[in-house]
Structures are given as structure tokens and as C-alpha cells.
């Protein structure tokens, strides 16, 4: 376990160090590099593009190390606007209460995800409930949990999404005390 964790951390550090400084366009790119080394982010980073709710669901499920579980999950979702690439992730995140729809029958998959919504989803993924924080104070709770120390706009760019996600790597799950990174390393093949 410790060897695997060390290897993943070393791979993440080497990946970031191997990229020339001028090729990185800020914290979002650095976070994307780290998450890519952990197989949480794949493909083009497009850090300045708006982050959609569908993209956030996919990243959240990967961060939880739950892609295989999501593939097996058959939870019914009432949403008809979820693209094929995100159906399993939305189903899984919705089934666990991490994300909700924007209406009863619409997920809002192509809409930009709000900072508040993603912070709430991260808190829920970590096992926190309405007894611990409310949707209204989700951003404050994320700061309290040290997921972020900076202010974001009302909606997130992909770079912002990557930064918040990378910030969650060292957050501890409420009930187990293990970090997201430790859990991710434990469930990674």
C-alpha cells in the first residue's frame, strides 16, 4: 500500500516536473497534470473552458475511485439530457446523493457547474451530510476542509474544477479518516 502510494505520488511529481514551466498556464494546468497522473483527468485539459455538470460528475466518480462500481450501478435516473459518456457517472453520483438534477427530470448536463454545487458534491462524496454543512454554505465548508483557499466565480472553468478536485486529494473521509488519495491508491489496479 505504501509503495503504491509512493509510486503514484512520485509519478505525479515527475509528470509535473517534466512539463516546461512555460507550457503550464497556471494552477488549473498543474492540477490537471497531477490528476492525469492519477487517471482522474483524461484527454485535453481546456482549462479556460466552462466546466459542465456532466464533466464534473465524471471527474467526481473517478476521484472516488468508483468507475467500476459506476459501470455496474443500475440506479434509475430521471434525466434525459445526459450524454452517453457521462450516464454511468451521473447515475452513480445521483444514486449516492452527491449530485442532483437542476429540475426533477433534467440534470443540466451541458450547463456550467456552479462553484457551490461542486463544493457540495465534494463534501457529500467525503461522507458529510446536511448535519455537517448546508448547500448554502458549501463553499465555506470547502474552505474549512482546506479543499481551497481562493475565491472562484459563480461557475467553474475546467481549470477551477481541476484545482478543487486536486485540493480534495488530501481531504479525509468523514467516517474512515483515510484521505481521498489513500483511498484512490488502494482501489487503483
Name what the model sees in each region.
Residues 2-88, 96-155, 169-189:
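Feature responds to low-complexity, polar/acidic, surface-exposed segments characteristic
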Amino acid at each position: 500500500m505504501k509503495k503504491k502510494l509512493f509510486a503514484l505520488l512520485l509519478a505525479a511529481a515527475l509528470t509535473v516536473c517534466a512539463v516546461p514551466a512555460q507550457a503550464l498556464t497556471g494552477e488549473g494546468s498543474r492540477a490537471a497534470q497531477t490528476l492525469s497522473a492519477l487517471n482522474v483527468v483524461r484527454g485535453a485539459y481546456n482549462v479556460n473552458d466552462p466546466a459542465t455538470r456532466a464533466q464534473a460528475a465524471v471527474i467526481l466518480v473517478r476521484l472516488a475511485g468508483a468507475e467500476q462500481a459506476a459501470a455496474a450501478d443500475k440506479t434509475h435516473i430521471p434525466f434525459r439530457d445526459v450524454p452517453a459518456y457521462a450516464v454511468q457517472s451521473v447515475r452513480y453520483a445521483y444514486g449516492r446523493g452527491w449530485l442532483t438534477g437542476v429540475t426533477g427530470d433534467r440534470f443540466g448536463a451541458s450547463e456550467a457547474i456552479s462553484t457551490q454545487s461542486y463544493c457540495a458534491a465534494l463534501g457529500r462524496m467525503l461522507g458529510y451530510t446536511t448535519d455537517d454543512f448546508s448547500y448554502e454554505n458549501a463553499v465555506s465548508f470547502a474552505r474549512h476542509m482546506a479543499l481551497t483557499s481562493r475565491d472562484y466565480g459563480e461557475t467553474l472553468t475546467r481549470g477551477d474544477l481541476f484545482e478543487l478536485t486536486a485540493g480534495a486529494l488530501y481531504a479525509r473521509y468523514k467516517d474512515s479518516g483515510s484521505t481521498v488519495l489513500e483511498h484512490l491508491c488502494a482501489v487503483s489496479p
